[in-house]
């Protein structure tokens, strides 16, 4: 083929190796928009290189979020990235898939057939918690006005354990609600139900029960809480309700412990949220919230939106977002079915129990959560242990092998207790877990045979957790 000078310039860029390009030999603008465009292959590589030192997401044992999906799911989600989940009239079949997901969850959570349950997808459990909190606040306000209570006399309040996820603090700040916290102690590493009612008054909008505390993986005793709430409701005109923050547990427990009473089978549990991108096995981010009956979602929170020629009811804080995660959730429901989810979660639980025993056998640690209810392994150094290293040192050692395993203080009254926790997800197979166990043993050996420079025994670093 013969080339002219123009042809040479036209095709020159394709003859230059990627790392011989002009863009790779100069510093790219980082905080202002660059003037000229560049080839897509170069832009791709530059962005990929910027992310290179973040580590392997599958070795991130700090996160609950799903880090693996099947290729078919990835293709399907990539093919639907452009669909706007809010455009119900434009994408009616996508809306139908969302509706099916809500119905599947209602069945999974034992919503009474005689009631009119309803629900919606969200960006994640944080948004779902906000919606659940708003519904409780508005319903409390409506009922308080009917009882003649002066709703301006003091702020409404929400009761939750100190193991709460930060979205609840945000909810209370954003919507002017007093958050009344039941502190955890060494005897109660979940909600102390007896102390709940020391905080209840006529301005209480509801109580949050947590099915899988982010710090430890433990469950609040929802059945006992429901029993106590029922006794309170029988004796008082003001009626309490329970919202379940099931960000982690609500997509795990129905498959591995279906007999555990925590869901809509309990009379006073009126709403539940969960994260599809945790044990729903979908990439971030998708969440869900369901109400047991329409009476628990005040009508003033439901908007009829006229959009692109259609009218639709909506209850959300976010608006435009891709429908791909909703479609990914439906794919998983269709692909796995009940037995598929059960098998996956049982294997994940088996992995957690194996790692828990590995940690315990080392002799250094006291197990706080062994992964039998939720596959979260949580532990602390034994109180009588005389070592020069801390859990923060252990976290640093594991990070050298690529494993991200956080160490952090427990909240509030237990802030002097430092714990470490790792999350077992579906993609942490038994063979990979064996590799982690070997690296864990090596890390302990290195710490025991290294000279550790003096530092404070434990530093009260704080870690934020998000849905």
From Swiss-Prot:
Q: Which InterPro entries match?
A: Glutamate_decarboxylase (IPR010107), PyrdxlP-dep_de-COase (IPR002129), PyrdxlP-dep_Trfase (IPR015424), PyrdxlP-dep_Trfase_major (IPR015421)
Reaction(s) the record says it catalyses: L-glutamate + H(+) = 4-aminobutanoate + CO2
Which coenzymes or cofactors are required?
A: pyridoxal 5'-phosphate
Query: Which positions carry N6-(pyridoxal phosphate)lysine?
Result: 278
**GO biological process per UniProt:** glutamate catabolic process
Keyword Thylakoid found: no
Domain of life, per UniProt, equals Bacteria
Question: Which EC number(s) does the record attach to this protein?
Answer: 4.1.1.15
Membrane-spanning intervals of the chain: none
Protein name (record):
Probable glutamate decarboxylase gamma
The species this protein was found in? Listeria innocua serovar 6a (strain ATCC BAA-680 / CLIP 11262)
């Amino acid at each position: 083929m013969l080339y002219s000078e123009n042809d040479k310039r036209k095709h020159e860029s394709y003859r230059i190796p990627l790392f011989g390009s002009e863009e790779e030999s100069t510093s790219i603008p980082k905080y202002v928009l660059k003037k000229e465009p560049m080839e897509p292959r170069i832009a791709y590589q530059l962005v990929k290189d910027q992310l290179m030192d973040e580590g392997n997401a599958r070795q991130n044992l700090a996160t609950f979020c799903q880090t693996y999906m099947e290729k078919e799911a990835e293709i399907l989600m990539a093919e639907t990235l452009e669909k706007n989940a809010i455009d119900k009239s434009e994408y009616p079949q996508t809306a139908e898939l969302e509706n099916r997901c809500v119905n599947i969850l209602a069945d999974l959570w034992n919503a009474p057939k005689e009631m009119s349950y309803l629900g919606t997808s969200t960006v994640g459990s944080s948004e779902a918690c906000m919606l659940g909190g708003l519904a409780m606040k508005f319903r409390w306000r409506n009922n308080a006005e009917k009882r003649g209570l002066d709703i301006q006399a003091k702020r409404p309040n929400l009761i939750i354990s100190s193991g709460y996820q930060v979205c609840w603090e945000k909810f209370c700040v954003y919507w002017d609600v007093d958050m009344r916290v039941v502190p955890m102690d060494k005897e109660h590493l979940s909600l102390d139900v007896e102390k709940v009612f020391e905080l209840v008054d006529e301005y209480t909008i509801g109580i949050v029960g947590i099915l899988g505390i982010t710090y430890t993986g433990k469950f609040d005793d929802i059945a006992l809480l429901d029993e106590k709430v029922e006794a309170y409701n029988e004796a008082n005109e003001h009626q309490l309700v329970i919202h379940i923050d099931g960000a982690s547990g609500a997509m795990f427990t129905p498959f591995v412990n279906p007999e555990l009473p925590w869901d809509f089978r309990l009379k006073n549990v009126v709403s539940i949220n969960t994260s599809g991108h945790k044990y729903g096995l979908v990439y971030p981010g998708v969440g869900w919230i369901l109400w047991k009956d329409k009476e628990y979602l005040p009508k003033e929170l439901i908007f009829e939106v006229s959009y692109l020629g259609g009218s639709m009811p909506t209850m959300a804080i976010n608006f435009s977002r891709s429908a791909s995660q909703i479609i990914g959730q439906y794919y998983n429901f269709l692909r796995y079915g009940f037995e598929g989810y059960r098998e996956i979660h049982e294997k994940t639980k088996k992995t957690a129990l194996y790692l828990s025993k590995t940690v315990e056998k080392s002799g250094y640690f006291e197990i706080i959560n062994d992964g039998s209810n939720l596959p979260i392994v949580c532990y602390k150094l034994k109180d009588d242990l005389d070592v020069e290293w801390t859990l923060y040192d252990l976290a640093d050692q594991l990070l050298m092998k690529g494993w991200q395993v956080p160490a952090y203080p427990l909240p509030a009254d237990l802030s002097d207790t430092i714990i470490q926790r790792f999350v077992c997800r579906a993609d942490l197979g038994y063979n990979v877990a064996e590799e982690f166990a070997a690296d864990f043993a090596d890390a302990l050996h290195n710490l025991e045979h290294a000279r550790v420079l003096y530092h404070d025994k434990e530093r009260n670093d704080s870690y934020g957790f998000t849905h």
